[in-house]
Design a protein with these regions (language model features):
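Core alpha/beta nucleotide-donor-binding catalytic domains of modification enzymes
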Residues: 1-157
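ATP/NTP-dependent adenylation/nucleotidyl-transfer catalytic domains that generate, transfer
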Residues: 149-186
Length: 186
C-alpha cells in the first residue's frame, strides 16, 4: 500500500490487485478498493478462477495466476506501454535469496525485468509498515503468510530469524547486493 500511496499522487496511475482466494483475500480486496475510491485511482482486480493442479506448489500456482493476470492487463491497448510497479521489499529479497539458495540457485529478485519494476527492494518491510502507520495508509497482512507449511513462510519465520542471530547485518549485506545488482531486461 505504501507504493500505491506514493504513486497515487501522480496522474494516470492505475492499481492492479489480484485476489488469490485465500481466507482473508476478500478483506485485502475491500481495503484496496476503498483506498482507490478515496484517492480516485483506477483499480483492476483479478481473481483465481481455477483450482490448482495436483502435485503443484500452491505458491507457484498463485504466482503464475497473478502474473498471467498482470500480462492480460498489460496486453490491453491502454496499458501496453505502462510499467508495472510491484511492492517487493528487502525482506522479500532475503527470503527469495534463501529460498533459491536452498534449491541451488541463490538468485536475487531483479529490480527490473521487462515491464516489471520493483523500486522498494532496498527498503525493509518494517520501514514500509512504519511509514504506512505514520501517514495513515491502510494495509492488510494476509494471515496465510504465517502458515509455515509454505516454504517461503518457513524461511520467513524460522530461517531468517536464525540467520539474523548468526549475522545481524544480513539485511545490510543484501541491500548492498540489491543496489549493486544489474538490471535484468527481457
Amino acid at each position: 500500500m505504501a507504493a500505491l500511496h506514493f504513486l497515487s499522487k501522480r496522474r494516470n496511475v492505475a492499481a492492479v490487485h489480484f485476489n488469490h482466494g485465500t481466507d482473508h483475500a476478500d478483506e485485502a480486496e475491500i481495503l484496496v478498493k476503498k483506498y482507490c475510491e478515496d484517492w480516485d485511482v483506477e483499480l483492476l482486480i483479478g481473481r483465481i478462477d481455477e483450482d490448482p493442479p495436483e502435485k503443484r506448489s500452491l505458491e507457484d500456482f498463485w504466482r503464475e495466476q497473478r502474473y498471467n493476470f498482470f500480462e492480460t492487463v498489460a496486453l490491453t491497448p491502454r496499458y501496453r506501454v505502462v510499467p508495472f510497479i510491484t511492492c517487493h521489499h528487502l525482506d522479500d529479497v532475503v527470503e527469495t535469496w534463501l529460498f533459491t539458495s536452498l534449491h541451488g540457485h541463490g538468485r536475487l529478485i531483479p529490480s527490473k525485468r521487462g515491464r516489471y519494476l520493483r523500486p522498494l527492494l532496498a527498503t525493509r518491510k518494517a520501514v514500509l509498515e512504519d511509514w504506512c502507520h505514520r501517514h495513515e495508509v491502510p494495509y492488510v497482512e494476509d494471515p496465510s503468510n504465517k502458515d509455515t507449511s509454505f516454504m517461503r513462510n518457513y524461511i520467513r519465520h524460522e530461517l531468517v530469524p536464525k540467520a539474523l542471530r548468526v549475522n545481524p547485518g544480513i539485511y545490510k549485506v543484501m541491500r548492498k547486493k540489491v543496489e549493486n545488482s544489474p538490471v535484468i531486461l527481457d
